[in-house]
Amino acid sequence: MAQGVHKITEDFEKSLCDYTGAPYAIALDNMSNALFLALYYENYVVGRIETDTITIPSKTYPSVPCEIIHAGLKVNFEKVEGNTIKGAYQLKPTRVWDSALSFTSNMYIPNTHMCVSFTGPYKTLKLSKGGAILTDDYEAMLWFKRARFSGRRETSYHDDYFDMIGWNFYMMPELAARGLLMMTQFYNIDGTPKHNEDLELPYPDLS
């Protein structure tokens, strides 16, 4: 269990699980880093990715191919007709999904790492900055939580021991607190969850 200032992040993650149907949620500073950690875990930690090339839509947010390359993989662009993309898509053939344009009740797809975004003016949950990984993989969840926090456990470093390399990708507690408050907008007055339509946005052709 998280301690101190990290408890509010744990509470926000629980609210994400309750709404999306995911067993676990890992809050991060942005979704680009969520994609990187999910791909890195699948590629290097468990070795589940059996190809060196990941296929994504040719029109998407520019950081997506960046994170694929950062995770030691190559990019193949799949042609997109029209000027927009809508909703979530798989980073083929992996378990990782880009869900920047999809955030709604019971959205979680089993056996995936779904990366959601709270950054920018167009997202359904607008925190100005932030993202999360939704997963049902317990071991992956444990790794993600430490990887985002410089390899540390959610305790004082005076009480911790250090046996893992990580990154500084954690969500600031004040953003988690704001997110926890804003999650109430996704419920009806009787407590039932609301459905949000997938977003559709124009992106440049990166191919």
Protein language model regions, located:
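A glycine-/small-polar-enriched, mobile loop at the entrance of the PLP active site in fold-type I
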Residues: 1-10, 184-187
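Alpha-helix N-cap/helix-start capping motif
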Residues: 6, 29-32, 58, 138
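Phosphate-binding glycine-rich loop
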Residues: 10-53, 67-71
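Conserved SAM-binding loop
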Residues: 27, 56, 133
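Alpha-helical elements of the RecA-like P-loop NTPase motor core of helicases
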Residues: 36-37, 65-66, 142, 177
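PLP-dependent aminotransferase-like
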Residues: 40-107
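Active-site region of PLP-dependent enzymes
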Residues: 103-105, 109, 113-207
